[in-house]
Every structure is written in C-alpha cells, then in structure tokens.
Amino acid sequence: KLLRTEALAGTVASHTDDSQAQRLGEWLLNDDKNQRENMLVVEDICQRLQHSTQTLEVLPPQVVRLRKVQHLRRCIWTELKQANDEQCLLMLQPTAAVAGLPRQPAREFIQKVEPFNREWYAGSAGYLSPEQSEFCVALRSARVQEDSLRLYAGAGIVSGSDPEQEWQ
C-alpha cells in the first residue's frame, strides 16, 4: 500500500569538478524557474493521487547529480487506500513532464504545433510483481527500423524557459 514516487523536473549541467557541480546544484535549488517547473509536477502528482491516498507527504527538494546533468527532485510518499499497482501506474501516466499541463489543452497544442508524430517519445519502464512494483518515466528512446535509426528526446518548457538553453 505504500507508494514512493518523485517529481524529477528542473535541470542544470553537472561538472566533473565537485565544487563546480555543487555550485551549479545550489543554483538549481534557488532558481525560481526550475522550482516552479518542479512544483508543477509535484502538484500534478498530488492532484492525481488525492482521492486514492490516506496520507500524502512531499519531502523537501534535493539535487540529484548525474554524470552530465543535475535534476531537482522532490520525493512524494503516500499510503494508498487500496493497493493496485496497475491502476496506480495508469493514474500517474502520462506525466506532466511528457504531456504538459493542463493536460488536455497541452496535448492538443502539441498535436497541432509539432511538425512530427511523437511515436515512441516517452513511456513507462519497469516491472509489476506480487511483492512490489517499480516504474520510471522513460524520456529518451531509440527506434531501429531496417537501415534507419530514430532517436527521441525532449525538454521541459515552462514560462521563463529559454528553449535553446533547455537543449543544452
């Protein structure tokens, strides 16, 4: 019945030098645009879970340092009224990071404005088992078809975003 999820939104470059990486991480923790982006995802997750949970706790923001980038993360812990992993997954997908907010207008905008079909752009990767389940949002993928390779990637755009910077 316990659900542990996270809002992983808001990104800055990482660095091989620990002190440089730490400075960038501190900037990320204090940047209004990235905090807003992360909170949009937090609020969306909480709203989707509100009718299915007994308790809901959002932990303070942290920086997750990876090799090339650092992300802003807020863990969300909850106790579900009923344990149903498949329903939980369906309730949370597609995430705000994939579909945008408000969800339906964002999806309609994407279909109208983007000059291509997203096809395999994003989805869920993970496993279901009787004891526990674990899933993550897969935001990068590749499709090999005969002699061609198509790569899929994207960036989160919110008010205040610099689209060129998002691709860095």
Residues covered by each model-derived region:
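Contiguous alpha-helical scaffold segments within structured protein domains
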Residues: 4-111
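Conserved hydrophobic core element of enzyme catalytic domains
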Residues: 75-168
